[in-house]
Amino acid sequence: QGVRCKEQGASLRVSESSAMLASAMLSGSRLDRRSKRPKVLLATVKGDVHDIGKNIVGVVMVCNGYEVIDMGVMVPAGDIVRKALEIHPDVIGLSGLITPSLDEMVHVVRLLREAGISVPVMIGGATTSRLHTALKIAPVYEGPVIWARDASQNAPLAARFLNADTREEALSDLRQEQARLREGAGQRSEPLFSLEEARRRKPNFF
């Protein structure tokens, strides 16, 4: 396990170096001078120190022509909001690996909404899911909240929501999908019993 982690770390460092080179090349290219590169703000939320997934996302986004501002790990919600107000990103990416990060992501997007921010927010990390994003995170935000299964999905998803030709369709598809997930979760939920009823229904193993 230790050897594997070291190999992953080494691979990531090589990828980050490649991304820095790609970013420098893009900055000097005619394409970059002609058009503004979309800006992505990345952060691992407060309480979470894991950053490998976030760093990989950053590498992928840079290699796809995005400008990435990485705030690192354990980033308080207020700091994310202040940075977003300062740099006006086109997309915000929130990462988390542990279960408490899910509640923190809800807190972050709520503060973003209160600050008048509605740019697309992308959610990723081992504990995140399409269902949790639809049930808990998306309802407290004005803009789109998009769950990405892995790092490879972030760039094409962001492009779809930022492109004027595909934005409306992407928003419509996302809203319909999340509405279906919320409806399905509501239908699957079972009624809760009182303590007395639960005791009456207890299984008899003898």
Name what the model sees in each region.
Residues 2-13:
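Arg/Gly-rich low-complexity intrinsically disordered repeat tracts
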